[in-house]
């Protein structure tokens, strides 16, 4: 039986990845920080909490990482732990940098020194591209991050490449573009929209958002974790862009959600109102980022050709999943 350890197992990607690995017969270890409150709601909804063995880990302490690996003896290590909210990274740049960079260095050092046969996956991000130099973005596109989050992730990405090339480790990075799901955190715009609209049906409180013209390449997290697994099943390690290759504006996303909920609306500029003139969606300057990234659209051709990765979802099915989940949680 293969064994895998997942940091960030209680997050969106961690939950879906754990479910995938369990379905493939893995023994799954969920690594978590001690005293984090053990927020398992995603794992509970996915019905897998009892199938995961949890281990406490401190990515800031190499000795602790070594002890965990001594105990688990994993075949694969998926590092998904991160402070992943871009907006918060401007408010907490130090915490974001330490969390998203130092931990990766410590993991790679322990693997290099003691467990060089472990296959390692690092969660990189399209936010590393930032001020883009070409569209669509691919594995060779130059990075120009526009947030502390993107900067920290770029460091970890290059570090993973360096350890692969310098020490012959099986270390891969997945440059994942935006991926959503019913398990997305409520601080992210897609989930803020789906949950907010479901609540609007009940209380009429409008959803406040930032720049509705921002474009994103949105996929489904369930598809993207399969790509993570596929990377570690190859004969040689490499880095891959995981994306849909299509973009939509936040306004597009809103319209599809309103249609899914069968809400009648009229739209003028960045405002959406119902038939009585009441706000459904309105903008608030406080939700606009200090530095917005340019058009992010990924080129997934390498992953499709080399990994034979085939996403099962499109934007419509993603939105349907998210809306139905929030209706079930909060009631229509």
What does each model-found stretch correspond to?
Residues 1-179, 222, 232, 313, ...:
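N-terminal Rossmann-like NAD(P)+-binding domain of SDR-like oxidoreductases, especially those catalyzing
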Residues 17, 23, 30-31, 57, ...:
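C-terminal substrate-binding subdomain of Rossmann-fold SDR/epimerase-dehydratase oxidoreductases
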Residues 66, 133, 184-185, 254:
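A short local structural element in Rossmann-fold oxidoreductases
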Residues 91-92, 148, 183-187, 294:
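Short, solvent-exposed loop/turn segments at secondary-structure boundaries
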Residues 178, 182-185, 213-217:
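Heptad-repeat alpha-helical coiled-coil signaling segments
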């Amino acid at each position: 039986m293969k064994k895998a350890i997942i940091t960030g197992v209680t997050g969106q990607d961690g939950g879906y990845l754990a479910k995938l690995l369990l379905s493939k017969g893995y023994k799954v270890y969920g690594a978590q920080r001690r005293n984090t409150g053990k927020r398992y709601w995603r794992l509970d909804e996915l019905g897998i909490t009892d199938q995961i063995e949890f281990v406490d880990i401190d990515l800031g302490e190499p000795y602790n990482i070594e002890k965990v690996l001594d105990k688990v003896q994993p075949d694969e290590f998926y590092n998904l732990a991160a402070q992943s909210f871009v907006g918060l990274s401007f408010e907490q740049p130090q915490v974001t940098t330490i969390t998203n960079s130092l931990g990766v260095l410590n993991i790679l050092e322990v693997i290099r020194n003691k467990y060089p046969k472990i296959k390692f996956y690092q969660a990189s991000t399209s936010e590393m591209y930032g001020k883009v130099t070409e569209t669509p973005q691919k594995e060779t596109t130059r990075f120009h991050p526009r947030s502390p989050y993107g900067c920290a992730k770029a460091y970890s990405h290059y570090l993973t490449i360096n350890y692969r090339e310098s020490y012959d480790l099986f270390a891969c990075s997945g440059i994942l573009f935006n991926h959503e799901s019913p398990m997305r955190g409520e601080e992210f715009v897609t989930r803020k929209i789906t949950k907010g609209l479901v609540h609007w049906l009940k209380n009429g409180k409008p959803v406040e958002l930032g720049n509705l013209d921002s474009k994103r390449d949105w996929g489904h997290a369930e598809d993207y974790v399969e790509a993570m697994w596929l990377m570690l099943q190859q004969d040689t390690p490499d880095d891959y862009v995981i994306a849909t290759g299509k973009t939509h504006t936040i306004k597009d996303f809103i319209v599809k959600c309103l249609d899914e909920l069968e809400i009648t609306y009229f739209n003028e500029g960045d405002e959406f109102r119902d038939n009585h003139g009441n706000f459904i969606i309105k903008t608030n300057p406080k939700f606009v980022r200090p530095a917005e990234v340019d058009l992010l659209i990924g080129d997934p051709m390498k992953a499709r050709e080399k990994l034979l990765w085939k996403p099962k979802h499109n934007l419509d099915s993603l939105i349907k999943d998210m809306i139905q989940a929030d209706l079930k949680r909060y009631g229509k």
